[in-house]
């Protein structure tokens, strides 16, 4: 690449980055993904490193970024609010450590303070003589915006400070500083964000794309009363200017901030062994979905302030800190088309067809659009650049459009009025978001999905039958209802491509074995609305046979523990339909078992009266095994978290259920906690207060003695 070409590319990169900075920092409306932005910045740094004569003072690599909006008064930060360099791999982290050790010298003893990197809005809070006098956003790192009135409305930000200490904190100052600038992150918990969006949607107002945008948009309101109504929170992570006291390390600073009354992330740790730092990063990357807030990485800082000063700052990045970035969970790509799928209950769901995009190491080509209201509220159009999110085991979904990238070619999309599979008019019940095809008996798309569900592992578990086989058998007219599965013949299957003698024999044997599945599995397979594994086992345990369940009145069903009015009404409605009763008789004629339950026999009443919700992946128990274990010891398992929930059992990649439990103050336990409850009638506190700092044999402090929030 010629010198002129390099200069042109550098100017192009700077222009792009400035534009993206403006949208991200000033408008709070990012138009590219973090991964795209990081790639541009990495390229610019590499080109400038190779051609230092082209570096200019106004390059994005030489200053922080952004320009404050004009609607708030500007605030000059007494010390720059620096950004952090990024590490994406273990090799990047080791390279950073090696640079630090090389600069500090071979005899340096280094400790590291690490914590999850919250995806919120950075602010600086200035206190004089213990009183909050000013609060400002980060802005461009040099100049921010005065949002004092709005920050005062956040309950977790103290308006006055009071120094306290305990014997274990004998290294902390016992007096208040004359001036202290506390830096931290304003954020919104995931559950609070979802509740806020629901409220805004119900009022017909614009909703937010993600918790960070919600926090930023809420904090930058001209009317503080609007901010006060938003569920904002604050975590302190450091200080700027400090006068009147002396602080010597990041670890001491965090404990002092906690003593002053600031919430500090309880997951902060201090290590002297860098291997522990690497393990911490790997652990949080694996369980990032366990957090009740959005986190996009881990921040690592050199603990000792004297070492920080010795290491200094290069351009916009301090040498003494780095951010380990998690793989992206969001990306921006183009929405090529919107199609619809018809489910087994007739619900018609819109689906986004996307330009393929990598998210967290997976190529995403399709994503959920949830329902018609979701599309309308976000004004999602075909041809839009859209934000796509993939988190944990959640199906990828479209967050919303990037309005700033529209060029006028985008087309609004209209939800169909008729079923794409059978042509029946779509209907929507009052109070529901879903449109349905109610042509239950004839719609081929619904039949395919019902067959898939009927043969699934949680139902009749027919090995060798799945989506492709269901579509083929329905298309060929071999299956007109799920009972027809049991009347398939070898000569019919032999006419189908790919079905040889061995495959036919295996499939027919699997179908024959399915006749003997317990009744609760058949109930699940029938697809009765609201009747899942636990409800089916409860029904069979209480009533014993399918005939008894079919004959039960709604009032009788409601008397069964765990079967409420909604579930009871759904069961009565299902069995009142002549087509469904005819299906049952056809299954009976096919020799399908109509009694028995697959759940465990009652072993004890240890968990009697307690209600559990399961979320995430447990270390050794499957979801079904954990549910069966709870039921066997007298407990009840439900699908949703409420104030009536006794415990939430959380494993890896727990999602919104965990967040809601934390919001409601529901006790959260892991698999070991569940087993402990079953083994004893005592109820150990699921979230004990943190003990004083412990030290392992390497001298690593394992737990910051902070309660957080």
From Swiss-Prot:
Using the record's annotation, list all stretches that form the BRCT domain: 602-691
Q: Which InterPro entries match?
A: BRCT_dom, BRCT_dom_sf, DisA/LigA_HHH, DNA_ligase, DNA_ligase_AS, DNAligase_adenylation, DNAligase_N, Hlx-hairpin-Hlx_DNA-bd_motif
**EC number(s) on record?**
6.5.1.2
Q: Give me the reactions it catalyses.
A: NAD(+) + (deoxyribonucleotide)n-3'-hydroxyl + 5'-phospho-(deoxyribonucleotide)m = (deoxyribonucleotide)n+m + AMP + beta-nicotinamide D-nucleotide
Q: What cofactors does the UniProt entry give for this protein?
A: Mg(2+); Mn(2+)
Q: What's the short name of a Pfam family annotated to this entry?
A: HHH_2
Q: Which residues bind NAD(+)?
A: 34-38, 83-84, 115, 138, 185, 301, 325
Q: Which GO terms describe its cellular component?
A: cytosol
GO BP field: DNA repair; DNA replication
Q: What is the lineage of its organism?
A: Bacteria, Bacillati, Chloroflexota, Chloroflexia, Chloroflexales
* Top EC class of this enzyme: ligase
UniProt keywords, alphabetically: DNA damage, DNA repair, DNA replication, Ligase, Magnesium, Manganese, Metal-binding, NAD, Zinc
Query: Bias category Pro residues: which stretches?
Result: 683-694
Query: Could you say which residues bind Zn(2+) here?
Result: 419, 422, 437, 443
Catalytic residues in the record: 117
The GO terms this record gives for MF are:
DNA binding; DNA ligase (NAD+) activity; metal ion binding
Keyword check for Translocase, yes or no.
no
What's the source species for this entry? Chloroflexus aurantiacus (strain ATCC 29366 / DSM 635 / J-10-fl)
Q: How is this protein named in the record?
A: DNA ligase
Protein's job: DNA ligase that catalyzes the formation of phosphodiester linkages between 5'-phosphoryl and 3'-hydroxyl groups in double-stranded DNA using NAD as a coenzyme and as the energy source for the reaction. It is essential for DNA replication and repair of damaged DNA.
Q: Show the segment(s) annotated as Disordered.
A: 679-709
Which family is it part of?
A: Belongs to the NAD-dependent DNA ligase family. LigA subfamily.
Highest taxon of the source? Answer: Bacteria
Is the keyword Secreted assigned to this protein? no
